[in-house]
């Protein structure tokens, strides 16, 4: 903060109040989070690409990828992100998991794809196939059991045929939003 009054009388005055500065851990930067293969029995790892600024992860072919994200899930936990796909696969999705094992209690959401998945929530399978980004907000705390999650999983499943599915995730954030205004509770002046 600066108060500058360079004229002869130098009578400038400023008041600053209720200022908080903190590191925001709710954004997922793929350049600083190791992107690993998820569950060796699922997918062949596929191919990944991370943008230089770390904001975007592309998973192609037949990939289930994971980043470590220790987070305490509460009923108000939300995940928001931009999603697009230019190559339709069988299953495109996102999940929160505690142990890197498929079908062992993870909370998984379908976003797009030709295959139905009875182990996934399909309420957010709304992507229109345009190849353009669409913003998605999922109130995961309403679906997941409260408790600790350790991983965020990014899915482009396409293990039949061409194996060329594509999922692109950008601007991924995980945070608590008690009052539903899509502002991280740690930053919300209303709380």
Predicted features, each with a name:
Residues 72-75, 86-88, 130-132, 146:
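Solvent-exposed loop and beta-edge segments used for protein-protein assembly and interaction
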Residues 1-13, 19, 81, 92-96, ...:
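Extracellular beta-strand ligand-recognition surfaces/modules
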Residues 25, 98-102, 158-160, 178:
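Solvent-exposed strand-loop boundary residues in beta-sheet-rich modules
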Residues 26-43:
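Short, tryptophan-glycine- and acidic/Ser/Thr-enriched carbohydrate-recognition patches
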Residues 3, 57-78, 88-94, 99-124:
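Secreted extracellular polysaccharide-interacting domains
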Residues 42-64:
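Short carbohydrate-recognition loop motifs
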Residues 177-191:
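Extracellular calcium-associated, cysteine-rich motifs in secreted modular proteins
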């Amino acid at each position: 903060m600066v108060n500058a009054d360079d004229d002869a009388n130098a009578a400038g005055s400023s008041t600053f109040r209720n200022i908080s500065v903190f590191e925001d851990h709710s954004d997922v930067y793929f350049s600083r989070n190791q992107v690993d293969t998820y569950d060796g029995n699922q997918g062949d790892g596929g191919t990944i690409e991370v943008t230089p600024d770390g904001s975007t992860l592309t998973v192609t072919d037949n990939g289930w990828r994971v980043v470590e994200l220790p987070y305490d899930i509460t009923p108000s936990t939300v995940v928001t992100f931009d999603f697009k796909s230019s190559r339709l696969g069988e299953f495109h999705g996102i999940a929160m998991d505690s142990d890197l094992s498929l079908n062992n209690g993870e909370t998984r959401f379908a976003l797009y794809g030709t295959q139905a998945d009875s182990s996934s929530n399909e309420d957010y399978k709304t992507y229109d196939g345009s190849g353009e980004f669409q913003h998605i907000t999922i109130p995961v705390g309403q679906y997941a059991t409260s408790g600790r999650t350790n991983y965020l999983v990014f899915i482009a499943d396409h293990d039949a045929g061409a194996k060329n599915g594509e999922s692109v995730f950008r601007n991924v954030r995980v945070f608590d939003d008690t009052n539903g205004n899509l502002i991280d509770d740690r930053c919300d002046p209303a709380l």
